[in-house]
Regions:
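Peri-membrane helix termini and adjoining interfacial loops of integral membrane proteins
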Residues: 4-11, 108-117, 164
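Short, strongly hydrophobic alpha-helical membrane anchors
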Residues: 1-23
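A membrane-cytosol interface segment of integral membrane proteins
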Residues: 217, 292-340
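Specific transmembrane helices
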Residues: 29-116, 134-146
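Short, charged cytosolic
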Residues: 2-6, 50-70, 151-167
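Coil-to-alpha-helix initiation sites in intrinsically disordered, low-complexity, charged segments
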Residues: 5, 13, 59-67, 73, ...
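Membrane-embedded catalytic scaffold of the fatty acid hydroxylase/desaturase
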Residues: 87-99, 110-111, 120-295
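Membrane-helix interfacial "entry" motifs
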Residues: 21-26, 69, 73, 77, ...
Length: 340
């Protein structure tokens, strides 16, 4: 029987990887980024209301009901988000997928291979200017890896079956960002580790190994700023567009909401996380001219399969098995909307 100390350690671990996330200043679901997202949404809703009515008066109760409607936050889809968040946090910690392959392991392997070939790492420059440049480089590298992994999740049928769990959300709250099949999360981590490991290793070989990027609360400065500056509104019902010019540089919450649209004209658009110029290169950029009414989810014929925890975890595996073992190459599965 475990000692009290061991039990307390286990309890602390469970807390840290579940509810503790909300108190981790480096996590996008921590209280500070959520509060900033609330402030932005509150201002936007009040401003639009004032433009519509011509009155500067703020109806606090009405505004709060608009920001936190029961029909969204207590929707069955949202409840599944909350459940899958807790289950995944524990499951992914248990398999420790992030330590199986990390950017550090990949970059160190590249450096060791370079040493075998007789290549020497250049001496490091720890000046602030280089640290800023390196931070920008790492942020671009991370965003590129996240974007191309996201692109593959939509274009490769087997990966789409896993990623479909995320897109099956019928309403969106900030927790929807954590609505992922564990294998989907594993693939994303693998792509990021490979890409960033190669990029970090290449930088170390050329400009020096000891350059440290700038961090804020344990997160890369650029990514932390992005998370605080409204990231949580990407998965929400609040439409915020940056305008045509800035939408071509940064992915706005509205653009990501379009990405989640079940309308066919919005399929496979806006794969970027921070920057939208990756989508310009891929030919997948969609910049809404005006506010659009967006219905979230996947095809109505498939949606019922993803309205339970069992469906969210088991259905993708079953469909992948049928694709690989039971269905002839190229043949669509029953209920497949063709969104691959």
């Amino acid at each position: 029987m475990p000692s009290n100390s061991a039990f307390e350690d286990q309890l602390a671990t469970v807390w840290n990887i579940t509810l503790g996330v909300f108190f981790d200043p480096g996590h996008f679901l921590s209280l500070f980024p959520l509060f900033i997202a609330f402030c932005i949404a509150f201002f936007v809703v009040c401003h639009r209301r004032q433009q519509k009515t011509g009155s500067a008066e703020v109806n606090l109760r009405r505004t709060m009901l608009l920001l936190f409607p029961r029909r969204i936050f207590l929707h069955n889809s949202a409840k599944l988000d909350y459940a899958i968040f807790f289950i995944n946090q524990i499951a992914l910690f248990a398999i420790a997928f992030s330590t199986v392959l990390s950017p550090a392991i990949v970059s160190n392997s590249i450096l060791e291979f370079g040493a075998v070939l007789g290549l020497q790492t250049a001496s490091a420059d720890t000046s602030l200017a280089l640290r800023i440049l390196y931070t920008v480089y790492i942020v671009l590298l991370w965003d590129f890896s996240a974007t191309y992994a996201h692109y593959l999740k939509h274009k490769v049928p087997v990966l789409w079956e896993l990623h479909k769990v995320h897109h099956s959300a019928e309403v969106m709250t900030p927790v929807t960002a954590m609505r992922r099949h564990p294998l989907d999360a594993l693939f994303g981590a693998f792509c990021t580790s490979i890409t960033m490991g190669v990029g970090i290793g290449a930088w170390a070989m050329i400009l020096g190994q000891d350059v440290m990027p700038i961090h804020v609360f344990g997160s890369l400065a650029g990514i932390w700023i992005w998370r605080v500056a409204g990231y949580n509104l990407r998965h929400s019902h609040v439409w915020i567009s940056y305008g045509d010019f800035w939408n071509r540089i940064f992915i706005s919450p509205a653009q990501h909401q379009v990405h989640h649209s079940k309308s066919q004209e919005h399929y496979d658009k806006n794969f970027g996380h921070i920057f939208s110029f990756w989508d310009s290169l891929l030919g997948t950029l969609y910049c809404p001219k005006n506010a659009e009414r967006v219905r979230f989810g996947i095809g109505d014929d498939e949606l019922p399969e993803y309205r339970s925890l069992t469906g969210l975890y088991i259905t993708p595996v079953g469909k992948i098995w049928r694709r690989l073992a039971g269905s002839p190459a190229g043949e669509k599965l029953q209920g497949d909307t063709g969104r691959t």
